[in-house]
């Protein structure tokens, strides 16, 4: 954890970066991207992952094929809504170790969910014995938990392009 003086320096650096790079919405050019088509993670067990994401969280499985780059490996996708896909690979025979938080790694994936589904998801997680945190940090709309391979998932009810109650594109 940074010292008090380091925290002051870090906040000053963030303020400098905001002043230099963060343009007011009216001055921002349109993004050259249309959105995230898909993100792909690595899992240890295809069926376990399907049961977690489809049966527990309610994200429909929309494709399951062999990974064209690694014979025997599966490549499969879940529909996250808004035409966004979450994909997975398994790599049987490689003996991959569980991931750790590291530079370049994924700290968590935040998935926008309807506010009225929060209690239903909590009930499903409780029934399945999945531990979760939230609401926390004063953000009632946010819940964190880990999938069977330790990938941290955040479900939040902020609409897309909102962060901590603030609309980012206006």
Question: Model segments located where?
Answer:
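Short glycine-/small-residue motifs
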Residues: 85-88, 154-155
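A short, acidic/glycine-rich surface segment
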Residues: 23-25, 63-64, 72, 93-98
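Vicinal oxygen chelate
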Residues: 1-29, 35-44, 76-81, 97-170
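Core segments of cupin and vicinal oxygen chelate
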Residues: 42-85
């Amino acid at each position: 954890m940074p010292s008090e003086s380091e925290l002051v320096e870090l906040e000053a650096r963030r303020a400098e970066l905001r002043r230099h790079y963060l343009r007011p919405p009216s001055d921002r050019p349109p993004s050259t991207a249309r959105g995230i088509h898909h993100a792909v993670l690595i899992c240890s067990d295809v069926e376990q992952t399907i049961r977690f994401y489809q049966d527990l969280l309610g994200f429909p499985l929309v494709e399951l094929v062999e990974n064209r780059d690694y014979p025997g490996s599966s490549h499969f996708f879940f529909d996250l809504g808004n035409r966004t896909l979450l994909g997975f690979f398994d790599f049987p025979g490689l003996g991959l170790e569980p991931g750790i938080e590291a530079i370049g790694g994924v700290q968590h994936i935040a998935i926008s969910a309807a506010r009225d589904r929060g209690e239903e998801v909590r009930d499903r997680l409780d029934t399945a014995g999945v531990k979760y945190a939230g609401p926390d940090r004063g953000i009632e709309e946010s819940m964190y938990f880990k999938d069977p391979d330790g990938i941290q998932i955040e479900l939040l009810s902020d609409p897309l392009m909102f962060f901590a109650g603030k609309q980012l594109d206006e």
